[in-house]
């Protein structure tokens, strides 16, 4: 193997690496463009206040009752104002930092927050009266067989969904404390 | 169901991601051929086929590896998230979602009018149906030219037609069809080179790669990148057969002369179809460019039947595309 051969091989590798770098850069620019053209697309925010002020969302629904086992503030906040307003707050358990509660609100019934908590089976679906609002409570188990529950209702044009890795009774208490 | 819901449903996501993955794969594979200085058409063809095979399986495979790949968290950390474009209205007038559907529609129309319909209408034989076709007799110029090319002599048919043309049928009864015009216009050594090229097609027809690739290409009918990549792979197939013909005849100049004569043949005009004269002109120009490139590489002595030594580069390219496409949702 001559020096010339090694140099040529190195140039080929460099040339391919540059190709990949250009494609990655191009993709990043193309991913950035929509946000630049139309601010308000889904993004992460450091705080509830930052999301509200940054996107002009007048009301973000937060529970007044908050179990001690959960950490405050939210571990993650995702929000958008385009194509419709939506906020997703994820709360971690104090002990291990695992996401155990997700609260989402969206001005569209089609919004699916792809939450970190995934139901494996739903064993019960119960209609519920939540301070005069019609709510739907679902109870079942998550992938790791732990108890999971979900409750959803409409607050005007905003659909609120709470998903928790806990029995339904705790989730109902949190939901009741969100009534205005 | 509105467009956003359609694009967010499983088939919609599969189509969008296959489209994007084929685009990135085609660009990277194309540039990789240049960057790695790949010369063998056998290897070049495999590079082009990455954009034909990969996107069919990439989305279900990635979802199987990571079911959360479609989640908001994943999308926020990706290189490119297509959903950011769907609801965008460019200059508050032009919605980007329907634009994508338009691009997919154009690719589908090209597939229908340039590939599927012509194949369904295809007539066997290079000349018009009224032409007389006879089997080449022993000792005839064509039969003599084909002697000793590769084991058993190929079955040759002579078609009564003044236009110089040649093609092979590789189905149940493989045979080569030559026109009387071709036999008359070529020197014996050129005729041998032309037949050798067709014998190469017949030999390679036993390999299912291009047939399977065509099935994949049909599945990705909506992807412009796959269309282009498949055509480039098909062009490499011609070069592979050129190289085999040069190997057995030892006369690249003779094959180059054949291609030059066929370039000007009316029989190689693109068949009529309903897509209009403009499209036919583009096809003709594209065909002519391909033939000229083949003539050039034969004249430059670039023909090679080597197909080893570049597999590591191929593996690196496939791996790079697979990793990159994982982050394109």
Where are the regions that the model predicts?
Chain A
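N-terminal Lys/Arg-rich, disordered targeting/topogenic segments
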Residues: 1-6
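Residues at structural and domain junctions
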Residues: 12, 37, 56, 157-164
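Hydrophobic membrane-insertion alpha-helices, especially the h-region
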Residues: 8-31
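Short, solvent-exposed recognition patches
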Residues: 32, 37-149, 154-155
């Amino acid at each position: 193997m001559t020096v010339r051969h090694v140099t040529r091989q190195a140039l080929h590798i460099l040339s391919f690496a540059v190709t990949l770098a250009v494609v990655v850069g191009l993709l990043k620019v193309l991913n950035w463009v929509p946000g630049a053209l139309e601010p308000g697309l889904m993004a992460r925010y450091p705080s509830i206040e930052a999301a509200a002020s940054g996107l002009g969302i007048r009301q973000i629904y937060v529970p007044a009752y908050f179990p001690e086992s959960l950490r405050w503030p939210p571990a993650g906040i995702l929000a958008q104002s385009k194509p419709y307003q939506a906020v997703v707050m994820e709360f971690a358990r104090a002990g291990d930092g695992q996401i155990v509660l997700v609260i989402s609100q969206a001005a569209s019934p089609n919004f699916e927050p792809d939450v970190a908590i995934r139901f494996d089976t739903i064993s019960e679906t119960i209609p519920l009266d939540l301070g005069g609002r019609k709510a739907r409570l679902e109870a079942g188990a998550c992938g790791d067989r732990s108890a999971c529950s979900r409750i959803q209702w409409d607050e005007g044009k905003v659909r609120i969904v709470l998903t928790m890795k806990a029995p339904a009774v705790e989730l109902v208490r949190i939901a009741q404390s969100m009534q205005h | 169901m509105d467009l956003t819901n359609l694009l967010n449903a499983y088939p919609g996501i599969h189509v969008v991601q296959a489209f994007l993955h084929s685009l990135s794969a085609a660009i990277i594979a194309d540039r990789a051929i240049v960057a790695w200085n790949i010369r063998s058409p056998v290897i070049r063809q495999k590079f082009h086929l990455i954009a034909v095979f990969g996107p069919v399986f990439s989305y279900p495979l990635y979802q199987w590896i990571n079911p959360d790949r479609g989640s908001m968290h994943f999308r926020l950390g990706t290189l490119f998230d297509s959903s950011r474009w769907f609801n965008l209205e460019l200059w508050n007038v032009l919605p980007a979602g329907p634009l994508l559907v338009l691009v997919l529609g154009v690719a589908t129309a090209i597939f229908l009018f340039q590939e599927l319909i012509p194949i369904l209408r295809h007539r066997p034989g290079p000349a018009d149906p009224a032409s007389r076709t006879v089997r080449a007799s022993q000792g005839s110029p064509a039969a003599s030219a084909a002697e000793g090319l590769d084991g058993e002599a190929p079955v040759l048919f002579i078609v009564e037609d003044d236009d110089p043309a040649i093609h092979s049928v590789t189905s149940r009864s493989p045979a080569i069809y030559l026109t009387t015009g071709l036999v008359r216009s070529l020197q014996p050594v050129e005729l041998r080179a032309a037949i050798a090229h067709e014998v190469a097609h017949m030999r390679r027809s036993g390999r299912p790669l291009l047939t399977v690739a065509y099935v994949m290409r049909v599945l990705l009918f909506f992807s412009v990148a796959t269309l282009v990549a498949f055509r480039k792979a098909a062009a490499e197939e011609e070069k592979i057969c050129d190289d085999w013909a040069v190997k057995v005849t030892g006369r690249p100049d003779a094959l180059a002369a054949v291609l030059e004569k066929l370039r000007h043949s009316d029989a190689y005009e693109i068949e009529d179809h309903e897509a209009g004269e403009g499209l036919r002109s583009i096809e003709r120009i594209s065909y002519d460019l391909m033939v000229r490139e083949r003539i050039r590489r034969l004249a430059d002595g670039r023909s090679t039947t080597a197909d080893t030594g570049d597999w590591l580069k191929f593996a690196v390219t496939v791996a790079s595309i697979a990793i990159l496409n994982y982050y394109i949702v």
